[in-house]
Amino acid sequence: MDAVKKPSKAYRAVKAIAEWQKTVWYPVLFAVAGFAAASFGWQAYVPLFYVMAVFVVLSALFCDDIKVMLVPVFLAYFSIGSDGALDTTGHLLSTWNTAGLVNMIIAGSVMGIAFIARFVRDGLVRDVFTRRGMLSFGFVLLLGAFLLNGVGSRYWQPLDLAMGLLEGASLALFYVVVLAVSNHTKGLCAYVCRLCLICGLMICAESWLLIGRLGAAGELFWPENGILKRDNITLGWGVANIISGTLVVLIAPTMYLTYTSRYSVFSYISAVAMFVTTFALNSRNAMLMGSIILVVSIIICLFGKNKTINRLTTLSLFCAAALVVIVTFSVIGFDSLPAFFGRLLRTSDADSGRFGLWQSGLRDYAGAPVFGTGFMHGAEVTPDYNAFSRFYHNMIVELLGATGTVGVLAFLVHIKGVFEICIRKFRVERLLIGLGVAAVIMASMLDNFYFYINMQLFYGSFLALAEVQLEETRAALLASHKRVEAGRKPRVVFTFVEAGMGHIVPEQAICDAFEKKYGNVTEVVRSRFYAETEDEHMKRFERGFVDAVKLQSRSRIFGKLCILGTKLAGNALSQQFVMKMRYPDSKADGRAMRHLRELNADVLFTTHWATAFYANKLSAKDGNRPYTVMFCPDAYSNGMFDIDCNDFLIPTKVGLAKAQHRRMYAGGRGTVVPYPIRGEAFALRGKKYELRRAAGIGDDEFVVLLADGGYGMAKLERTVEELLALKADLRIIAVCGKNEKGAERLRAKKPSAPTRLDVYGYADNMLQLVCMSDVFVGKSGANSMAEPTFFGMPIIITKCITPIESGIKKYYTKIVGNAMYIPDPAKAARTLADMAAHREKAEPYIYRARWCAGEYGADKVADLIYSRVVEITDAPPSDEYKVISYE
């Protein structure tokens, strides 16, 4: 047998480099090269950028950890070198040697191509477009507002569109990139924070070397007043304000490592070094905002697992700083303190022209309050050096002046999501990452930082990290459910919540199936969660759900407003509002939590998100957090179902795909299950004519069944009236549910031959009525669509009360194909009359119902629930699961 050929030495060397790139020394070496490239002209930055490009290509081809590709993302920009002082007054290209600039662009392009190629290869580009984050909606709104900047203003120009696209896309770019990377790696938060620390130290080194050079050349201070020549402090990628602003943004993620890492002293000193460098750069904005960020970060780090060493480090640094101040002013004299602070704060240039810029921005907003005057118009009190020189140097004024009310509203929706990520299931580590986001916003109150790509890099990345950390927290909480001790029957609680019968009916079917199959090995509890306590607050709360459904039945606008409110406020805030903020309904919250503890569920099953909301509030320390299984009966879930649960079940593949696209149910399993139709439905299959004869209905009659859910409050009456007016040869069965007045009005009508009319109120034999009918007509409720489809019936949908029901309508009309959407009662009646006269027209819909719908039945759902019971049981609850030893 031929020997297996060993890899060549070159290949082994390349693989060794790829493995080395996964260590912290790769970004350290990259930063050292970046420091040299940024500091020593084209003779350094040209070869070093090509070396960086080689390393990026190697990592793209051979490294198996995708997060390594973030090294050039965070460090390459701050490695840009120059051959002269950065010129921002309209002659930007004069900063570089032409050949050097061209080569730097080529090397940078190689890095970019390698990065994109790796993203495509690993499927991250697909993730960007198929997995939506919590902030995606807000970023899309901002992009739309930025694209519309200046529309309708007399100052608008095509460049405004280009600038809006650039700003909106770059603002969201790094958020989606880092979020996509998180799907393919682990330990991302700590890794990115280490990159921030390394980047900050690299910038500090670049800054201090530049300051030293300027000092040696006598170009650091003005000789007449000793004030720093800040215009001379420029690197290839930024002026003093931008350099110092970047350092401020990097303080918080560096302090994240101080809070979490065992090398906390090093990261602590590094953060202080970044802050001290802002003083050396003499940026008042950075000194002010950096002080706030650093002090808050220090206070946070005085607690937690590293609190002892962090407190000692704080005390040591405070003493060292005090000693330096005392010695320094002992030498130069304490009487020089006022003059020193005057030079440091540049009191002679108090506002640096900011007030005039802000007044100009507010005037522009007053003249174009809807979409603003556009990014390219800008303040009229500054020279037009470059695209940013006429920005208003305050992000709120910039949003007002350039994008108008539309931009501000989009930002408010976005920032609401930012707050939600930072405070939802609060963790201190996430707060430190959020402080990095806050640093960008705070620093942008006195500058244009929010609109600079280097700041957008960190802004988007930190938001993605905060979301990743939130998902990790949610997953950890889900994993903290209680287990079933050996020798005890697992307690499975089915909670019934009335918010339309579409939640009740499928849960009854699942509970019946589970109790029949596994009732002997588990303790099954049927809980009418709100009603059984006899607590008036609990009863009123459930009535609120019912009333909301009825109101949505009467007013489609109300339903759309509910969904719009959820989109704008976000899922978590919407849930909090419904469950805890509506007085007096909010009084039910405490009693509901107590009742959930009283139920003492090992496994909690629900078809309504309310009880899952309560279960999700129980902590691991509570010792009573159940394993939660939630079934959404709709074709597509909505934001209110975005409750963390251990198992999320839905009856359609498209519904699960959409839920996963929205990154819902972090940490929980998502499963497509058969629709849990009631068990007696299977016994009725094939008995259509037997049931008809028992009801006195002829075999050849064309029977139309109309029902509008449990409350009967859609278009049933109008459709019946239109059918009666046509005098078609058919039988109408109208089921009015709990709408007793509607039933009375229909019973009072006298149909003319050959039309027959049977009117029911709330029908306990609904499945029999469905089975004996030829076509179903009504609103697109989950159960209302599933049962006729099970019996192979065509469906005419006359109303979609909410966007949820619009999704159900879409599923049955477009995917299953057995339904038609005819919202006009008169047209629906004509279609039914035509179908009664030409019954062959129903055949395609019958075929689609029989062959294109998914599976049905509650047994598989019951089996899934029991499999979860076995998973969380320390000793399986049945002899059937005993482990046999063959030793």
Which residue stretches match the model-derived regions?
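Flexible juxtamembrane loops connecting transmembrane helices in multi-pass membrane enzymes
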Residues: 228-233, 309-315, 326-360, 380-383
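Alpha-helical transmembrane segments of multi-pass inner-membrane proteins
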Residues: 147, 170, 189-220, 236-303, ...
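Donor-nucleotide binding loops and adjacent catalytic segments primarily
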Residues: 697-772
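Aromatic-anchored transmembrane helix interface
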Residues: 100-109, 133-146, 156-180, 195, ...
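Transmembrane alpha-helices of multi-pass inner-membrane enzymes
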Residues: 252, 294, 432-443, 449-479
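Hydrophobic transmembrane alpha-helices and their immediate junctions
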Residues: 403-441
